[in-house]
């Protein structure tokens, strides 16, 4: 048996042969940082102008940066930050850029502790005075803040603190973190701190105290969505490095750009489309990426997004969606909110969950519509009044599979014939 296995082709041999599609697929990922960011020079120049005083050991203005996902906000700020640190090192001044993702680090304690950790980590020869490492939990917040101030002061210089996804921090933990950080300069003598907040959500400002907003938004920048020609340029820049010569049909990049332009000009979506198209061609052992591969990649991305969306739904939303799936599987291609409510109320005793009102069920249906899981429309039924009709415009097999996985086996025990009995 061992001999047979040794003589047979290795499981990965076909994937290790010369790749006819990719030269370096890593350049097609979001994490890759190109040396030039196409169509973002005005924004980069603005950020550089605002941060330039740091090179004179002066305090730069705080900045709030807005823009939808995939519009180059983080990449532009990181690019300027890297250039700032390089110029600072050549001039013999101290400018440090500290980047935090507030989707992950989303409490005041963790933000302050992480800033401290990054400051300590960047100091190759720390002062003997700075021996205290702030633990990630356990201290009173005022002690963490006091220790962070000491570390900033003893590492004298200008610190640019980037709070990416700042809206996630504010929505979860309030604006205390920003209140403290925007006022930290009043307690410093040898160092300066500037804050850059990056957000996809303009509305998060409503969560801020006016004093915090005033301090934080000394400068505001908006990153507009990319249009299709701009996305073409971005993809072309990456494709030259990432794909083998002649691996792409001429129509592939324009199609990826056009599809992503429809999704609010999202460069990340465009890159994902191009990379996944290449991966599909590669797995087929093809020599070219075609328009058909792009169409398959688009369908795959949409399915993956839908699956992730459904997995993160609250339990009650999953139950309401399950009721709709039962109707669909019973042959009801268009169904009304009243039918969903009747099935829901029949199932709740078996599922041992709190029973929602018809109004709340209608709200959950509206949320599922906004997420793109279902389609709805209001129709007038004469003397019976208005009602909400709904339907699925996608294959429901994957949705059903995810709902079954997420239900801990409870829904698998439901007799689907219950729908027929209820609707008689």
Curated annotation (Swiss-Prot):
ATP binds at residues 71-75, 226, 238. Keywords: ATP-binding, DNA replication, Nucleotide-binding. Involved in regulation of DNA replication. The keyword Ribosomal protein does not apply. The gene is cdc6. This is ORC1-type DNA replication protein. GO terms for molecular function: ATP binding; ATP hydrolysis activity. The keyword ATP-binding applies. GO terms for biological process: DNA replication. It comes from the Archaea. It comes from Methanospirillum hungatei JF-1 (strain ATCC 27890 / DSM 864 / NBRC 100397 / JF-1). Coiled coil: none annotated. Belongs to the CDC6/cdc18 family. Pfam families: AAA_16, Cdc6_C, Cdc6_lid.
């Amino acid at each position: 048996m061992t001999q047979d296995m040794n003589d047979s082709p290795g499981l990965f041999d076909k994937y290790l042969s010369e790749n006819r599609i990719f030269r370096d697929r890593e350049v097609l990922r979001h994490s890759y940082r190109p040396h030039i960011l196409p169509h973002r020079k005005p924004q980069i120049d603005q950020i550089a102008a605002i941060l330039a005083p740091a090179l004179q050991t002066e305090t730069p203005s705080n900045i709030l940066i807005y823009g939808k996902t995939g519009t180059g906000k983080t990449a532009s700020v990181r690019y300027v930050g890297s250039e700032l640190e390089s110029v600072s090192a050549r001039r013999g001044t101290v400018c440090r850029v500290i980047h935090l993702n507030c989707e992950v680090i989303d409490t005041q304690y963790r933000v302050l502790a992480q800033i401290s950790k990054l400051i300590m980590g960047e100091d190759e020869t720390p002062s003997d005075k700075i021996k205290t490492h702030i633990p990630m939990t356990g201290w009173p917040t005022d002690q963490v803040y006091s220790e962070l101030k000491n570390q900033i002061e003893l590492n004298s210089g200008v610190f640019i603190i980037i709070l990416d996804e700042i809206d996630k921090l504010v929505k979860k933990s309030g604006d205390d973190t920003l209140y403290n950080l925007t006022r930290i300069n009043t307690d410093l003598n040898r160092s300066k701190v500037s804050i850059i907040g990056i957000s996809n959500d303009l509305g998060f400002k409503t969560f801020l105290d006016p004093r915090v907003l005033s301090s934080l938004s000394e400068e505001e920048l908006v990153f507009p969505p990319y249009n299709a020609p701009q996305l073409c340029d971005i993809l072309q820049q990456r494709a030259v490095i990432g794909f083998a010569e002649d691996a792409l049909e001429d129509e592939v990049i324009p199609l990826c750009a056009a599809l992503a332009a429809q999704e609010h000009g999202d460069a990340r979506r465009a890159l994902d489309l191009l990379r996944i198209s290449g991966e599909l061609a590669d797995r087929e052992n093809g020599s070219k990426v075609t328009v058909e591969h792009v169409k398959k990649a688009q369908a795959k991305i949409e399915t993956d997004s839908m699956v992730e969306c459904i997995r993160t739904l609250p339990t009650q939303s999953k139950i309401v969606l399950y009721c709709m799936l039962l109707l669909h599987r019973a042959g009801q291609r268009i169904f009304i909110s009243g039918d969903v409510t009747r099935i829901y109320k029949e199932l709740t005793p078996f599922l041992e969950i709190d029973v929602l009102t018809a109004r709340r069920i209608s709200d959950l249906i509206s949320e599922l519509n906004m997420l793109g899981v279902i389609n709805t429309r209001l129709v007038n039924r004469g003397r019976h009044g208005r009602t909400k009709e709904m339907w699925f415009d996608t294959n429901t097999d994957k949705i059903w599979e995810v709902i079954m996985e997420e239900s801990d086996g409870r829904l698998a025990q439901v007799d689907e014939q219950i729908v027929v009995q209820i609707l008689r």
